[in-house]
């Protein structure tokens, strides 16, 4: 356990150094830039929303999850090519580095900052007020939180997009798209054979029932229903609620050969008065095909040790 923490700490330090160097190169005018976030100007032109400015790492050494150097596909001044038609396959990560996908204080386009909140119904507001989250402007002490994930319950969906969205492998098969997530080694199956949703779902699922379609050669739209909610799953780290009536739409838009934008819209008539957008054009970059990610799992025994050694003392709880 101690060794694992040392490895993660070393990786975080290395990642910080890499992106700090990228920032210095950007200030000195080195390297091209793609702009996919709210505000700021990039040399690549164009503006989007919700993801922040994309930092160029074209001339930096690329490391995989184990610190192994890889061949950087954009090294030596190479520029991204056009988006391949109807293809979002590959290994993707947040374009501004793994930390951009953590989203501890809420989804990137609706953070919990005390200034704005989603459009709750009375039932949604009551559910939200009953949640004691570890993050956000109403954060509580560790051992006082009632977040289901504190017991290593599955994050569920769409929270999988709103917390620890790190390296993501997308595999396109004949009749389905499979998405593999680094955090908790989760996977989702999205049917692409033209089927509709079942007339009746026998059971709701942690990650729901998903069907996908191409709306144009660069945009893949996924709709998901049949989700577990009602206090077993939260929408995000800050305690926003979701019910089993939630519907989710994801739009994966391939900007070019090496950049993709993810937009997520949620609709839940039980807890929200209208649909809203937690993630708007969140930029993700394509990684090297031989990128080997490091394992990240929530182990109940580790969570128990954390509570005993750190969470309880920090919360003033004596056992």
Where are these regions (language model features)?
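Bacterial N-terminal signal peptides that target proteins for export
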Residues: 1-8
